[in-house]
Amino acid sequence: MSATLRFGEGNLQYDAQGRLRHLLSTEGLRERELLQILDTAESFLSIANRSVKKTPTLRGRTIANLFFENSTRTRSTFELAAKRLSADVLNIAVSTSSASKGESLTDTIDNLMAMQVDGFVIRHPEAGAAHLVARHLGDSALVVNAGDGQHAHPTQALLDVFTIRRLGGPIEDRVVAIVGDVFHSRVARSQIHALSVLGCPEIRVIGPRTLVPEELSALGVHVYHDLQAGLRGVDVICALRLQRERMESHRLPSLDEFHRRFGLTPERLQWAEPGALVLHPGPMNRGVEIASEVADGAQAVILQQVAHGLAVRMAVLAILAGAAGGA
């Protein structure tokens, strides 16, 4: 399959009129679309406080969730986002679908399109899977990348940026540090692109040499292999999960060694600016990349990220469907 995933060709995210039709990566997104998503998400936040938590924005539309990897937060919030927009939702259990019998991804999509599906949310272990589907469908249905291999996770980056903007102040005044397993992280790459477009003055990446790709410096980020030096002057800390399921054994001596050098503890949090926000995309490895005292502490905004993720994903679906315009 990977030989067909030429996801570097062109920008499939925009239609012929220059409108955002698919969300595949934060790379290649213009500032105006990023701001449109963030501002629309702000308007959708209030729905959670209503007695009837729905808006008719996508009434009559059908959204299919295809998750080829395990997920709790992303899958749940996409399902709830579509339902709160009044869409019909198909949750495809890939382990019991024809895909488990060898059916190709595009054949699966074609069969669902025959049922008049209007949009697809796709998580897949191979980088470029969502791009393959978007190229296959063109403008006939919207596609949202919910994570593809180590490549991208755009909605996670958008909800992180939304959280920073809402709780931490203007992004153009914040110094942001991304700490941990950057090598395997699709989230980090997506965060870097989004923060850069929105004018973040300094993005730092902190981690052991084996878990920080050398080519990141080409994106304009500052790379640190010492946690104390990297956290000095930082306003926002994004801690990343150690992705042991993707990791080759030689990249990490031990979990204890990682925590000793790069784990975020209350004492180390003091190296950053007073009141620095702490984010984590989840799921957390408590006692490895983040101590429970920090994860549950006053500076952590991890549960707020989850709540914001629902509003951001509602905004993405509404905008891609051409139906944004009010909650």
Curated annotation (Swiss-Prot):
Which EC number(s) does the record attach to this protein?
A: 2.1.3.2
Judging by the UniProt lineage, the source's domain of life is: Bacteria
Q: Which UniProt keywords apply?
A: Pyrimidine biosynthesis, Transferase
Q: Which residues are listed for carbamoyl phosphate binding in this entry?
A: R73, T74, R123, H153, Q156, G282, P283
Q: Which GO terms describe its molecular function?
A: amino acid binding; aspartate carbamoyltransferase activity
Q: Where does L-aspartate bind?
A: K101, R186, R241
Q: What class of enzyme is it?
A: transferase
Q: Which GO terms describe its biological process?
A: 'de novo' pyrimidine nucleobase biosynthetic process; 'de novo' UMP biosynthetic process; amino acid metabolic process
Q: Which InterPro entries would you find in this protein's record? A: Asp/Orn_carbamoyltranf_P-bd (IPR006132), Asp/Orn_carbamoylTrfase (IPR006130), Asp/Orn_carbamoylTrfase_sf (IPR036901), Asp_carbamoyltransf (IPR002082), Asp_carbamoyltransf_Asp/Orn-bd (IPR006131)
Recorded GO CC terms: cytosol
Catalysis: reaction(s): carbamoyl phosphate + L-aspartate = N-carbamoyl-L-aspartate + phosphate + H(+)
* Pathway the protein takes part in: Pyrimidine metabolism; UMP biosynthesis via de novo pathway; (S)-dihydroorotate from bicarbonate: step 2/3
Q: Which HAMAP family match?
A: Asp_carb_tr
User: Which family would the database say this protein is a member of?
Assistant: Belongs to the aspartate/ornithine carbamoyltransferase superfamily. ATCase family.
Q: What is this protein called?
A: Aspartate carbamoyltransferase catalytic subunit
Gene name?
pyrB
